From Swiss-Prot:
Identification of the protein by name: Voltage-dependent calcium channel beta subunit-associated regulatory protein
Compositionally biased residues, Pro residues: 360-375, 471-482
Annotated segments matching region Disordered: 90-124, 185-275, 308-339, 360-421, 438-536, 554-648
Lineage top rank: taxon: Eukaryota
Length: 698
């Protein structure tokens, strides 16, 4: 128990009482001396109190010092750990990031200590290592302005499993939200009254209803499932006037329908104050919720690289740690559209037309009359303005004006009624599309041999100014369109371009160039003429093409099999790949040999051989191949009795030349060396005659 100030005062009062008592005693007995034990006790108490107070002061100072040292130690340790687990190392060029002008007024000191510490370490030309997660923490300022909520594949599967789990929750109501710039965020967050009184365009019905052909739209977003279903509110087209891409929060007006005890009704629709963060979250989450939804119709903004986020350049640089996420993002986002286009048009067109016209199953990806075509990587930008509509058969022409499109409108309505009974799901629709493409390409007058393109019927290109819809019952024959010039022809590389180069113009092309009589499609689907089934068997052309690409060494199979080991040879095709890697055409060099000369037979290559030099241990083939250097062999008795010593005899020059010519004549199959060699100059020419070694396989 430590002495306190109260105890010290109590001791002092005790000492005073004792002093007065001894004073009284001294007056009565003046000669008596004071008690030495009592004096020692008082002195002891005073010294003890002084000692304890000093100890307390020293201890508090030591503790403060230790605390300060511990903080410094922790900071140093944290810096070391960040340097160990760093993900990036940049060579800092001394340019300090300028602070964002929006965030400047928020904190008086400018930036927090993390940034200051990072900037303090970065002097010119030093290597700066840091943990990029610490820098991404800065993006929490300015209400998460550049923040993007990216779903990785793990999150995606987790969400998928969560969707299949039966939670007893009422269906969640989600407003479909377009991404808008920060300037429009205030206008976009204010709720607009719903313009139509009809029920919302419900892409996913609650589990009570049956899923009809209407209810399953082409964009199958993730949150709606067999159990936890989602109603997507429609977009009111009136909002396109004030903000370029408006958000209709009809969930505010009709939110009471779906709000149960678990849902928070104020979260979605009530005020712009409460719903701002949720709207922002769904704005960023919308694209990732479905990987393939209606993405071609939306403009995808690039990531905003804030100046304080130095590590965000990793998204554009190809660092191997990010490749997986770049692939995931590329799978989930559509490509950037060129130019500034109104991106909300498609959904507003659907919402204003009502859900009866929104997703007619025969033509699911028709764009609105004003919206641009979806950007496909295979389409050229120059052709995007006037291309044919998605599945338009080629007879409908390459450029259809709006007048032509309006002539065909009653026809389209009729065809849509017919087709709604037959195309119930995506797969039957796709099969019918393929059949339609097959028959249309038979009648087509677009030259496959010239363009290397199947006509644009199955390419899925979008419609420029309101192109004609596909007529799925037998296509009405309009007069054949003019062929585009070769310069303007689309260079779409399709699957059948290989066939187009092989087959040339088929017989069907000439037939269909005759003007066909106009015929109207029969009324009932059963009366339609039976389309040819698609044949998936491989014909001879495909087989020949296939084997042409997979050809291998022809002498390999003819050689007798060596059974000495289990696998004496490399596999034929593998060996073929390893041998002729650098030569384009295997048969080209040998094809020009004169027919009278017999090709030398070559033993099959064994493991480790190259094409023309066998390894040192193995002798040259007896039949003799083309050697790169002519080998001059000695005569059998050459080293023997004629010249004792080393066998280097000086023979007359004529005999030596005759010998050389004879051996060259045996070794080379060229008829040029048949005449006798006269002089040494001709010999030089003859020795140079074996041309550079032939690297093609035998």
């Amino acid at each position: 128990m430590q002495p306190t100030a109260t105890m010290a005062t109590a001791a002092a009062t005790t000492a005073t009482v004792a002093l007065t008592t001894s004073w009284d005693n001294a007056t009565s007995r003046p000669t008596a001396e004071p008690d030495p034990i009592l004096d020692n006790y008082v002195l002891l108490v005073v010294v003890m109190s002084l000692f304890v107070g000093g100890t307390l002061v020293v201890l508090s100072g030591v503790l403060l010092l230790c605390k300060r040292c511990w903080e410094v130690h922790q900071r140093f340790n944290r810096a070391m750990e960040e340097a160990e687990k760093t993900t990036t190392t940049y060579l800092d060029n001394g340019t300090h990031p300028i602070q964002d002008p929006d965030c400047r007024g928020e904190d008086p000191e400018g930036q927090d200590t993390e940034t200051e510490r990072f900037l303090a370490t970065s002097s010119t030309g030093r290597r700066v290592s840091f943990n990029e997660a610490a820098l991404f923490e800065q993006s929490r300022k300015a209400q998460d302005k550049g923040r993007r909520y990216t779903l990785t594949e793990g999150d995606f599967h987790h969400l998928k499993n969560a969707r299949l789990t039966h939670l007893h929750l009422p269906p969640l109501k989600i407003a479909t939200i377009h991404e808008c710039d920060s300037g429009e965020a205030s206008a976009a967050a204010t709720p607009h009254p719903a313009t139509t009184s009809k029920d919302s365009l419900a892409i996913f019905q609650p589990p009570g209803k049956t899923l009809t052909g209407h209810s399953v739209g082409p964009s199958s977003a993730l949150p709606g499932g067999p159990y936890n279903s989602v109603d997507f509110s429609e977009i009111s087209p009136s909002t396109s006037s004030d903000s370029g891409e408006g958000i209709s929060l009809d969930a505010g007006t009709r939110g009471a329908k779906a709000a149960g005890p678990e849902t928070v009704p104020g979260e979605m629709g009530t005020g712009s104050s409460g719903s701002g963060t949720v709207l922002q979250f769904f704005t960023r989450l919308r694209r990732h919720a479905s990987l393939d939804g209606a993405s071609p119709y939306f403009k995808v903004k690039k990531w905003k690289l804030e100046p304080s986020q130095r590590a965000s350049s990793l998204d554009t640089r190809g660092s191997p740690k990010r490749h997986h996420f770049q692939r995931q993002r590329a799978a989930s986002e559509s490509m950037e559209q060129e130019g500034d286009v109104p991106h909300a048009d498609f959904i507003q067109y659907i919402a204003s037309a009502g859900d009866s016209v929104a997703f007619p199953p025969p033509r699911p990806f028709l764009a609105s009359p004003t919206s641009p075509p979806p950007t496909l990587g295979r389409l050229e930008a120059a052709e995007a303005a006037g291309g044919a509509s998605p599945e338009t058969p080629p007879e409908h022409g390459i450029s259809l004006g709006p007048e032509h499109a309006q002539q065909q409108d009653p026809q389209q309505e009729q065809d849509a009624e017919h087709a709604q009974c037959s195309y119930r799901d995506l797969w039957s629709l796709r099969a019918s599309l393929e059949l339609h493409a097959a028959t249309a390409s038979d009648h087509s007058s677009s030259g496959n041999d010239r363009d290397s393109v199947r006509s644009g019927d199955s390419s899925g290109s979008g419609s420029g100014g309101g192109g004609a819809a596909p007529a799925f019952p037998p296509p009405p024959e309009s007069p054949p369109a003019l062929r585009p010039k070769d310069g303007e022809a689309r260079r779409l590389l399709q699957m059948d371009s290989g066939y187009a180069s092989i087959e040339g113009r088929g017989a069907g092309d000439e037939v269909s160039e005759l003007p066909a009589p106009a015929r109207s499609p029969p009324r009932s689907p059963r009366a339609w003429p039976r389309r040819p089934r698609r044949d998936y068997s491989i014909d001879e052309k495909t087989d020949a093409l296939f084997h042409e690409f997979l050809r291998h060494d022809p002498h390999f199979d003819d050689a007798p099999r060596h059974r000495t080991r289990a696998h004496p040879h490399t596999h034929a095709r593998k060996q073929w790949q390893q041998r002729g890697r650098q030569h384009s055409d295997p048969g080209g060099a040998r094809a020009a040999t004169p027919p009278g000369v017999a090709r030398p037979t070559r033993a099959p290559l064994r493991r480790g051989d190259s094409v023309d030099c066998p390894p040192e241990g193995r002798a040259l083939p007896i039949t003799g191949d083309d050697p790169s250097i002519p080998v001059i062999e000695e005569e059998p008795g050459g080293g023997g009795g004629g010249c004792p010593g080393s066998g280097l005899c000086v023979e007359p020059a004529g005999a030596l030349l005759d010998k050389l010519a004879a051996s060259l004549d045996e070794r080379l199959f060229s008829p040029r060396l048949a005449e006798p060699v006269a002089s040494s100059q001709v010999l030089i020419v003859a020795a140079a005659a074996p041309t550079s070694p032939d690297h093609s396989p035998a």
